[in-house]
A protein has these predicted regions:
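N-terminal amphipathic alpha-helix/helix-capping segment at the start of soluble metabolic enzymes
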Residues: 1-23
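Short beta-strand/loop segments at the ligand-binding rim of alpha/beta enzyme cores
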Residues: 16-18, 65-75, 109-117, 156-165
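Catalytic beta/alpha-barrel core
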Residues: 22-23, 44-51, 72-80, 93-101, ...
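Conserved, mostly hydrophobic/aromatic
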Residues: 37, 88, 137, 178, ...
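Glycine-rich, proline-tolerant flexible connector loops at the mouths of alpha/beta enzymes
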Residues: 42-61, 190-198
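Catalytic cores of alpha/beta
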Residues: 81-91, 125-132, 170-184
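Glycine-rich phosphate-binding active-site loops on the catalytic face of alpha/beta enzymes
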Residues: 99-105, 140-146, 183-202
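Residue-level detector of conserved catalytic or cofactor/ligand-binding positions
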Residues: 200-214
Length: 214
């Protein structure tokens, strides 16, 4: 079961400002990536469930984080149904991120007091997610929006907490644009942990992780 409450997870999202996203089938390489992000200051990792037996990799990573990386909060993304959410929560997921807004996922996460962040693309979807108890909404796909969209949302709904995923890079100007617009945190995947970076050195993950302007 989850080690951290949804309020604790939400607070760390706000404090650190960045949620790295990553999937790889190799457990040992995944541990190295997780450690590199941790060394760079990340205290959350969204393990994206996108491969066969991904739950087995996550289980190993979560055990590693609990044993070796104090304060590292493991969650799971790309979750598309309540059954998958329940499986990952049984394996200790502290938060669930989804590409779509689904009430069935909200119900199983709320039952266990686990933070869930649904992918939303309109203000109507965001409002519905908040009515279902969402603390931090995922703006997805972020690369079809821009910081101006965040400002437009925060006008009538200043209480809304938003995490854009996609369209966010490690460049300081890009990050500054999103945070100046009012996002709570950002999700960064291939722009931070790319296949090319993995072929070079994991320091290329640690260094950009430190750039989040919080």
């Amino acid at each position: 079961m989850a080690k951290y409450s949804r309020i604790e997870v939400a607070n760390v999202m706000k404090e650190t400002g960045m949620v790295p996203l990553f999937f790889h089938h190799d457990i040992e390489l995944s541990k190295q990536v997780l450690k590199a992000c941790y060394d760079g200051g990340a205290r959350l990792m969204e393990f994206t469930s996108r491969g066969d037996f991904a739950h087995e990799v996550f289980a190993a990573l979560n055990k590693y984080a609990l044993a070796e990386l104090p304060g590292m909060i493991m969650g799971v993304g790309s979750v598309t149904d309540a059954a998958a959410a329940s499986l990952y929560m049984q394996l200790g997921a502290n938060f669930i991120v989804t590409p779509v807004l689904r009430e069935d996922i909200a119900l199983v996460c709320n039952r266990r007091k686990v933070l869930w962040s649904p992918g939303c693309g309109t203000l109507t979807e965001i409002a519905k997610a908040e009515e279902l108890g969402c603390e931090i909404v995922k703006l997805f796909p972020g690369d079809v929006y821009n910081p101006g969209f965040i400002k437009a949302i925060k006008g009538p709904c200043p209480w809304t907490s938003i995490m854009p995923t996609g369209g966010v890079t490690t460049e300081e100007s890009n990050l500054r644009g999103w945070f100046d617009a009012g996002v709570t945190c950002v999700g960064i995947g291939s722009q931070l942990i790319s296949a090319d970076v993995l072929k070079l050195s994991l320091i290329h993950i640690s260094e950009p992780t430190r750039r989040t302007p919080i």
